[in-house]
Amino acid sequence: MESNLSGLVPAAGLVPALPPAVTLGLTAAYTTLYALLFFSVYAQLWLVLLYGHKRLSYQTVFLALCLLWAALRTTLFSFYFRDTPRANHLGPLPFWLLYCCPVCLQFFTLTLMNLYFAQVVFKAKAKRRPEMSRGLLAVRGAFVGASLLFLLVNVLCAMLSRRRRAQPWALLLVRVLVSDSLFVICALSLAACLCLVARRAPSTSIYLEAKGTSVCQAAAMGGAMVLLYASRACYNLAALALAPRSRLDAFDYDWYNVSDQADLVNDLGNKGYLVFGLILFVWELLPTTLLVGFFRVHRPPQDLSTSRILNGQVFGSRSYFFDRAHCEDEGCSWEHSRGESTSMSGSLGSSSWYGTIGREPGWCGGSQTRTTPLLFSQVLGPGGHHHSLYSTPQT
């Protein structure tokens, strides 16, 4: 064997693409990054319990998905320290869990964010047009259907490719077209929902303000998601278009030239390992880290000076986003409260997140008056004057 190789290729040319020390350093760097994200999300889940936030909410489900995603990616890269051949030749179930399932979890987190903000927008519109509330079921069904379609396509493609029952190029083409189209659509939907939440002030932007997030930050995060996932789709399609159908080795990236996951069964080379890590960093670790940072758990205020007062009730800044998500389905009032407010006393049940509606003519030129919600809400004094909730009412 040695004589045949020496006759074909000079001995000096038989060197690895990357030195072993570089490969080991890359493995340590990849594992450390994913492990740091894992412990960061794990700590935030403990903060939910420590601060007394709602245990089952959009926020906790989102963090749990990110925790599982980071755990699977950390486990995958830990194989490459000593057991690289085993990582490249896994059985169908371990292969799907380590390579394919993290991509599905990432898509589920994206659809979860879309679902929540879409509900916020629909509930804001339903105040003026009650028939809009019927469309909320259609929105939920659409996102659930998209998640199931994404999961089904990825599972089938992974199983068929591992059993060699279909052409790898055809499977990759189907998966890339479906998966990346859904990623781009959901990213555009998330950006649109964030813009609507920010623009429909004050009825919806209260969520961003109470969260401590500005409109610019929300728009920047949405724009970053669109750019990242759109570039991901373009990269995948370009890799497939430039690769021959018989062997997918375009750009010398071996079978990791498609960024979603590995569907072919060739061994992972050193150059492919380097590019695989960079791809996961740009198109998986970076967007997930941005979302985790944007929806992180906040510490509630400990004193009344940093709390908000609404109709005599004191609310901390933790009444934001996902901590009160149960209000959407557990009977919290989203209806308009009618009648004049004559004092700062009252109950939360007679108001809504979006403020109250009074019957004082002359303000805004109509028969109804609409107060701004939560942080900027006002009540009527005895003389018909408006007094800010941050000032002492006149007696």
Swiss-Prot record:
Family classification: Belongs to the GPR137 family.
GO biological process: autophagy; negative regulation of bone resorption; negative regulation of osteoclast differentiation; positive regulation of TORC1 signaling; regulation of autophagy; regulation of bone remodeling; regulation of bone resorption; regulation of ossification
Cellular localisation: Lysosome membrane
Residues in compartment: Cytoplasmic: 53-60, 111-140, 197-222, 296-395
Function: Lysosomal integral membrane protein that may regulate MTORC1 complex translocation to lysosomes. May play a role in autophagy. May activate Wnt/beta-catenin signaling to modulate epithelial cell function.
Record-annotated membrane-spanning stretches: 32-52, 61-81, 90-110, 141-161, 176-196, 223-243, 275-295
GO cellular component: lysosomal membrane
Annotated membrane topology: Multi-pass membrane protein
Name under which the protein is recorded: Integral membrane protein GPR137
Keywords from the named record: Autophagy, Glycoprotein, Lysosome, Membrane, Transmembrane, Transmembrane helix
Record topological domains on the Lumenal side: 1-31, 82-89, 162-175, 244-274
Entry-listed glycosylation sites: N4, N257
Species of origin: Bos taurus
